[in-house]
Amino acid sequence: MKKLFLITVTILFVTSIVAQEKFVVREITDTQKHSRMVGQANGIILNLISYAISQGNSVEEVAKFTGDQFKTGWNKENGWEGFAKGCLNNWAIFIPNNKLVILEQSETMLKFQSKTPYVWLKNNGPQYNVSYDEYMTFLKINHKIIAEYLGADISFKEVEDGIILTVKKK
């Protein structure tokens, strides 16, 4: 009887080990998903810049090309105000746990502060042969082209604890 019990338990034990799945889909929080997707987006931006440079183009050229592509996705009828609202949304989303602060606003201007974008790159140096300064050059030019298309101007000022963006109606 003990033998039968021992054999049964052994078979159940071995079966449970063999039946375990090698891969499982783990639960991921929305915060983790968001952070991962921002990382993926930044990686794609860096890879785009790196590829453009490897093909003899400058960061400025690839930023202009990208801005020209992206600008037509914005509703031109929403003008500078649509751009300002879009910037608020995009900057709130593009940096995990970002808390935007509106510093000033009027009928023709919006000034807000954001956390530093892609702080890992800033603190750890080049990735995919792209520096933080090149990354920021790309973002600034890209934004300026879209702003112009929508009748706005945008400026960036890096400060100790983030970046200040000023959007003005032209």
Model-predicted segments: where are they?
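N-terminal accessory segment detector
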Residues: 20-138, 148, 153-170
